[in-house]
Structures are given as structure tokens and as C-alpha cells.
């Protein structure tokens, strides 16, 4: 079985809606393979939402004008194409804009229903004079990529409904480059750098994750031809390898007090992996293993970035250290190999 080193993916945020992702090390040639696939998927296949049609009160077609509105309907449509929305609804959703002049009309004047959000409320849509009045019904749908107004036009649609171009993709720009990187003595590995800029409706991180999910599903079709086919297995990451090494360590490496150590050994807990698979309730069931022993174990595990199976969130190992002191956790003169030693019921530290 051939095993390749697992690459790491690091996000380097540039701004709120732009990030640079670095993936390395990749086998020679895979930088371009992965980079091109990610770029095309990010630009064309990330789900989003967009306005697909509008209906303006008193307007029959897109070449009309609205009394009291500086912009004609064509300009208004161009402005609405810049609207950034997101929708949790699978079905088409209607939102309304109602504004009376004088003054500017912005996206903040739109009243979205539940499940729909306007992400650029500062967008200027139109300008009204003293007698101006604007009422618009906007239909929002979910989709992918780009759909033209002609494709959005439905057979038998009502008079006065104007289909518009829909840009569903929430990703604005994607670039990538491949550099050489070194792994031990080899210098021909690839480092892939992907620069992703998105609309406010999605973060670059979520867009990248969505693209990865799509590609995994598509490439899985080839794997389904023969699930037992031999390939290059990706080895564990450095973090996973370090975790596995920590879990394999004997509990002697934790430098526990003799009391806690002997209680665990009598229970048949010999490695850190066996220890973290137990809950606090499991440990409290051990004879002579009380709350102070629990706190000691949690403190030692916390220093290693580990915790018991059911440790509540927010446990601060440093607080336990401050409470009980570090000296209290140093071994005493008792023999740690005496697994069968008897203890009195009160805990002594």
C-alpha cells in the first residue's frame, strides 16, 4: 500500500470576504489538478440566491418609466442585479419594496420575509422626487451559476412581471497559483495557493468547504466502480499522528499522584487513550477515586489538549491548578507499582 503525506490546508484571511488558502505539500502535478478543479467549482457551482423577476406597480414592461422616479426601469433593473441576498427557502420567495419620495431608495427599504436576508442594504436603487412613489414585488429563488432573463421567463406569466438576469454565484473572484515546496530532501512537491473573494452572503471558508463537498461527491462516482481498487492512501495529518501518539502513552507519563495512579491501574486503565474513553461518572465509580482525583486528571489531560469523554465545556485546567497547586500533583513516596494497595476513604493531597 502506497501512503502519501497528508497535506495541510491553512486559511489566511485578508479581509472579511477574502481569504487565501494554502494547501501543501501536494504530490508533483496535483497542485494544478486540484487548483483548477477548485476554481471552476467555486465560480460555477456554489449555491446562492438571486432575484429572478420583478413587478413594478404601474409598469408593463422593462422599457417603461415610472412617474416621479429619476431612473427608468432599465436602470432600475441594472441596480437590482447588484442586490446580494441569501435564502433558506427552497421555493421561490416574494419580498416587497415600498417607498414614497422625496429621497433615495436603497436596498434597506426592502422588506424581506423570514428566511431571506439582504446583505448590502446600502445599495442605491433609485431616486424619487416630491411626487415619486415606488412599489416593487421581487421574487427570490435559489440556484447556481448564471441564468439569463430569457431562461427566467415562464410560459403564461402574468402581464407586468419582468424577468431579469440572475447571478446566483456568491463567489466574486478566484485565482490560484502553484509553487514548489520542499519535503525532506525532495523539492518537487507542490504548494497550492487559492485566493477566494466572495459576496457578503457567504464567507470564503464556507465557499471553499462547499466546493470541496461537491468535488468529493463527483470524484466518488469513479471510486464506486471498484471500491476495492488500489490507490495512494493519504496518511494521517501531523496533528492526528501526534494525537495518536499521545493516546498510546502509558498513564505513568501523566505524573499523577500515587493515589490516582493506583486507582486507575486497579481499574485496568493503562494508557491515556483508555482514560479519555471514560466519563467522570465512570471514574467516580472507582473506589477511593474522588472529585479531587477527577480534577487532577482533567488538569493533566487539559495540559495535553485532551479531556474526558463527558467533560463539560468551559472547564479551565488553570483554575484547578490555582485551587490545588502544582505541588499537590507531584508523586509522593508511595510505591506506584502497588496496584492492590488499600486506601482510606478520605482523600489526602
UniProtKB/Swiss-Prot annotation:
What residue spans carry the region label Alpha C-terminal domain (alpha-CTD)?
A: 241-349
Can you list the GO cellular component terms from the UniProt entry? cytoplasm; DNA-directed RNA polymerase complex
Gene Ontology MF annotations: DNA binding; DNA-directed RNA polymerase activity; protein dimerization activity
Identify the EC number(s). Answer: 2.7.7.6
**Subunit annotation:** Homodimer. The RNAP catalytic core consists of 2 alpha, 1 beta, 1 beta' and 1 omega subunit. When a sigma factor is associated with the core the holoenzyme is formed, which can initiate transcription.
Q: Which family does it belong to?
A: Belongs to the RNA polymerase alpha chain family.
Describe the function of this protein.
Answer: DNA-dependent RNA polymerase catalyzes the transcription of DNA into RNA using the four ribonucleoside triphosphates as substrates.
| Descriptive protein name | DNA-directed RNA polymerase subunit alpha
Amino acid at each position: 500500500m502506497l501512503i502519501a503525506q497528508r497535506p495541510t490546508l491553512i486559511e489566511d484571511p485578508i479581509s472579511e470576504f477574502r481569504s487565501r488558502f494554502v494547501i501543501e505539500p501536494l504530490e508533483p502535478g496535483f497542485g494544478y489538478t486540484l487548483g483548477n478543479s477548485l476554481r471552476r467549482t467555486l465560480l460555477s457551482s456554489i449555491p446562492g440566491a438571486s432575484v429572478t423577476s420583478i413587478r413594478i406597480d404601474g409598469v408593463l414592461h422593462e422599457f417603461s418609466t415610472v412617474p416621479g422616479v429619476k431612473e427608468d426601469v432599465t436602470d432600475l433593473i441594472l441596480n437590482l442585479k447588484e442586490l446580494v441576498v441569501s435564502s433558506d427557502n427552497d421555493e421561490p420567495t416574494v419580498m416587497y419594496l415600498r417607498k414614497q419620495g422625496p429621497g433615495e431608495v436603497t436596498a434597506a427599504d426592502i422588506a424581506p420575509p423570514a428566511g431571506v436576508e439582504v446583505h448590502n442594504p446600502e445599495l442605491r436603487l433609485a431616486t424619487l422626487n416630491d411626487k415619486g412613489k415606488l412599489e416593487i414585488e421581487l421574487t427570490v429563488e435559489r440556484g447556481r451559476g448564471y441564468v439569463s432573463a430569457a431562461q427566467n421567463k415562464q410560459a403564461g406569466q402574468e402581464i407586468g412581471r419582468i424577468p431579469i438576469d440572475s447571478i446566483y454565484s456568491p463567489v466574486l473572484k478566484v485565482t490560484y497559483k502553484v509553487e514548489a515546496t520542499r519535503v525532506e530532501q525532495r523539492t518537487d512537491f507542490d504548494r497550492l495557493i487559492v485566493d477566494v473573494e466572495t459576496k457578503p452572503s457567504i464567507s470564503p471558508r464556507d465557499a471553499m468547504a462547499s466546493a470541496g463537498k461537491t468535488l468529493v461527491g463527483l470524484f466518488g462516482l469513479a471510486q464506486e466502480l471498484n471500491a476495492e481498487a488500489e490507490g495512494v492512501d493519504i496518511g494521517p495529518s501531523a496533528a492526528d499522528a501526534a494525537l495518536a501518539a499521545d493516546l498510546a502513552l502509558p498513564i505513568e507519563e501523566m505524573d499523577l499522584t500515587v493515589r490516582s495512579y493506583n486507582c486507575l491501574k486497579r481499574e485496568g486503565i493503562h494508557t491515556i487513550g483508555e482514560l479519555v474513553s471514560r466519563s467522570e461518572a465512570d471514574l467516580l465509580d472507582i473506589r477511593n477515586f474522588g472529585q479531587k482525583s477527577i480534577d487532577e486528571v482533567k488538569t493533566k489531560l487539559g495540559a495535553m489538549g485532551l479531556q474526558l469523554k463527558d467533560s463539560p465545556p468551559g472547564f479551565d485546567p488553570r483554575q484547578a491548578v490555582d485551587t490545588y497547586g502544582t505541588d499537590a500533583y507531584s508523586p509522593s513516596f508511595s510505591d506506584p507499582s502497588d496496584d492492590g494497595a488499600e486506601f482510606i476513604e478520605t482523600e489526602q493531597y
